Amino acid sequence: MAFVIGRRFSFAAAHHLAGLPAGHKCSRTHGHTYEVEVQLASPALDAAGFVADYQTLEPLRHYLDCDLDHRDLNEVLPFQPSCENIARHLFGWCQGNLPSGALVTAVRVSESPQSWAEYHAGPNTGASRPAVTP
């Protein structure tokens, strides 16, 4: 059993996806208001009764606001900016940049209220080291 908490963030950005069939709407530059949900887990609570203080996630807010918000993701990310790849990237970013006590278990990225992708800790991602980020 474990306690799980989450926090949502949003950012607006444009992108296009290369390699799609001619005429596919995602092959044209378009934008989304992305919703990012990060989940942290712990088998026990700390002395304050927290899995982690939500302030632990402020570096992620800063990264989203300063590096991704109102940008063309094709210009600022070194990979095809699909929702799946963005989720994997943010998972790895969190593991590498948040305080070591914060056990990130999943990152979900929504590009619309109906569409999302999630990358989560599993047997091949490890809990203490960043996942391979494209």
Language-model-detected regions and their locations in the chain:
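Charge-rich, low-complexity N-terminal segments
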Residues: M1-P134
